[in-house]
Amino acid sequence: MDDFVYFSEDPAVEALFCRLLSERCKVDFMGIVEWFLGVHFSWRITSSSVNVHLNQSGFATNLVESFALQERPETPTATPYRSGVPIDSIAPSTDADDSPAQIRRKEAFQSLIGSIGWLSSTTRPDMAAAHSFLSSYTNKPASGHMKAALYVLHYIHSTHDYGISFTSNDVAPMHSYIHYPPSTDAEAYADALPPTTSNSNTLTAYSDACWGSQLGSSVADGTLLPLFKFRSMNGGIVFKNGGPVGWLGKRQE
């Protein structure tokens, strides 16, 4: 059995699709989507707008429980990245590759990083950079890398219902600096114009990079840079209808 989601702006087209599909195979139409591939859809529909919030709270809660962190106090003001403790500055593991401690740590670390990656690529762009850093150490993680990954997991525990939201009548917060704030910003302009459908359906992209090391220190010219260190990070995100539809946070090649 396969699940799928479909949509149409025209009720007649949607009805035709349902009829033709039913004639060809056995199918159950279950109404407005609430769960799909572990993602929860929360809808708020009014006469003037349609709003939806997507999160993976169930997956996040199960992940926290699998590492027995559910009793830890929540700290929703935290971030997934420990300020002042750069992941690249963590001392490498000194355990032999075939030692029991290293094998256990590697298995747990890879499992956790894979789960964090699933969250960060689906509904949690806020964890993309931390996941990118940690992914560099899946081959031989040290205990410090595991602590950093568990710090991200504690952040997930504190923000398990975070996700991404979309609305039918919102506009992107910025199109370019010369048009900021946009003419639809009622807080900025007393004569603000109401957003139109064309405003809402506009793609707006942002990109940035940190120039250099996350260690925060300079090195002399000609210094040989270690692998996975001192490389800039690229970041980018694309918005549509008030929410992100694509993002990345990764090291430059």
Regions found by a protein language model. Name each.
Residues 60-253:
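Divalent metal-binding acidic/histidine catalytic loops
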